[in-house]
Amino acid sequence: FVNQHLCGSHLVEALYLVCGERGFFYTPKTGIVEQCCTGVCSLYQLENYCN
């Protein structure tokens, strides 16, 4: 997993992959779209959104 742009369904799929059974919280207010879609994010940054 390298730092990459993740938008829309790709972002959701990546969160499912990273978080697994823990699940994740996805609200527009968290800035994940700005971080991962507008910019790039790492696996470690995605883990911050897991429950």
Swiss-Prot record:
Record-level Gene Ontology MF annotations: hormone activity
SS bonds (residue pairs): 7-37, 19-50, 36-41
A Pfam family per the record: Insulin
Main subcellular location of this protein, as a coarse class: secreted
GO CC, one annotated term: extracellular space
Stored InterPro entries: Insulin, Insulin-like, Insulin-like_sf, Insulin_CS, Insulin_family
Superkingdom of this protein's organism: Eukaryota
Keywords: Carbohydrate metabolism, Disulfide bond, Glucose metabolism, Hormone, Secreted
Compartment(s) of residence: Secreted
One of the GO biological process terms: glucose homeostasis
Signal peptide: none
Family named by the database record: Belongs to the insulin family.
Physiological role: Insulin decreases blood glucose concentration. It increases cell permeability to monosaccharides, amino acids and fatty acids. It accelerates glycolysis, the pentose phosphate cycle, and glycogen synthesis in liver.
Quaternary structure and partners: Heterodimer of a B chain and an A chain linked by two disulfide bonds.
Additional free-text comment from the UniProt record: The species of elephant is not given, but it is most probably the indian elephant (Elephas maximus).
Descriptive protein name: Insulin
Species assigned in the record: Elephas maximus (Indian elephant)
Lineage of producing organism: Eukaryota, Metazoa, Chordata, Craniata, Vertebrata
